[in-house]
Amino acid sequence: MNNKVIYTSMFGFADNTDYYLHTPECKMEGWDLVCFTDNPNIKSDAWEVRLVTRYYVDGARDNRLYKILPHRHFKEYDVSVCVDADVLITNNIDDIVNEHLSEHNLSVLDHSICGMTKTGNLNRRSCIYQEADFIKWLGDNHPRKKYKDDMNIIFNQIKKYSEDGYPKNNGLARTTVIFRRHNEADVIEAMEKWWMEYKYNSRRDQLSFPYAVWKTGLDFKYMPIDIDDNQWFQLMKQWRKERQSKK
């Protein structure tokens, strides 16, 4: 068995046969690949598919149970890379993982540069307060006034963080890809805090991540990698659109 794992999760489509896992475009020597799902129709030659029980009505909550808490599920691995299910691995990631975990036990994409080359400033945000306003703006401008979450929940969460002294312009993670030495004590403490904040607040996990790592004092790294323009990961946007249209 390897000591490094790449993992993803896919919940909420247990009766649907349209969804699939993206097979990496390169050899993943030294890595195990694991997918957690409630869908018995998901099959893959590249990924070990682990069929697990759902605990929440909202599949996003089950997804985050695995996304946020790898130390509960991968005690036998030293290093984990979590990728969203709509991410295709396009090149060997050994060097980039080693680089970004050389001095930190956790590294995550920096939202302030994500989309900067192709989608412009609209997608570049560096603060949970900006993110909350952006979510409201998206919903207000949606033809059916469709919001990514209940805005009362979001604004109450943000208000709580503000009253606790959480600063503005303190960074924003894009949690599409996360590198971790997940069994280290400082990471475990921060991830358990993140889970508690996520579990009882908004389903938008990027709102609770910065607060959790700030509150626990985790020394982590924002990776200067644009998910829309890099050599290691490709966001399969069409797959995402098709998946969301079936919700």
Go through each PLM region and give its residues.
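N-terminal anchoring/stem segment of glycosyltransferases
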Residues: 1-64, 73-77, 200-204, 215-218, ...
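A residue-level signal for conserved active-site and pocket-lining positions in enzyme catalytic cores
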Residues: 6, 33, 71, 86, ...
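Short His-Asn-centered micro-motif
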Residues: 7-10, 36-38, 83-85, 91, ...
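Extracellular structured ligand-interaction cores
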Residues: 30, 82, 174-175
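Short acidic (Asp/Glu) patches
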Residues: 61-69, 95, 151, 155-162
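GT-A fold catalytic core of metal-dependent nucleotide-sugar glycosyltransferases
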Residues: 68-116, 121, 127-131
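A contiguous pocket-lining binding segment that forms or flanks enzyme active sites
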Residues: 116-156
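Catalytic core and acceptor-binding pocket of nucleotide-sugar-dependent glycosyltransferases
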Residues: 139-246
